[in-house]
């Protein structure tokens, strides 16, 4: 009888541990940072340096993919996390001011995200670059050639509207350059604000 009682308690303990493991795994799988995401982001950028005589104004629209967390830089007992994810984007910029009309590019960057314990709000920082093509014009102070490289950085805030949808807002800076392939090489430096919608893919 004592053996039967011990066996019963053992089986109950195993069942409770298994339920706890399932619950923990399910909770982690629900974290937004552990899923592939797609987002559409747009904004308005103004020239911030005098490297060109043109007063550039750019509207950047991006299709962005973010990977699940690659690794955690830090994880607190409360559930807060500092994560690193991969960010890839197809960029379409329209020039509201300036001799060029558009810029098409691809970019890649790490996305560093500090998540609150409630898994609904995160601060993010991204820094990266890429390359693309614009419709250059033969005018002094313009970009001089179609091939242009880019470097960008962005910091902002995201908030989950639901388990599968989020809203983002940020401060965005980007630099365009042809790396000295033309002389002069005026480049473009613009700074502004962005907003975006994020959808979970899996």
Model regions: which residues?
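Outer-membrane beta-barrel "beta-signal"
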Residues: 61-63, 188-202
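Short loop/turn motifs that connect adjacent beta-strands in outer-membrane beta-barrel proteins
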Residues: 28-35, 69-84, 115-122, 161-165, ...
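Cleavable N-terminal export/targeting peptides
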Residues: 1-33, 202
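Transmembrane beta-strands of outer-membrane beta-barrel proteins
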Residues: 34-40, 82-90, 104-106, 123-129, ...
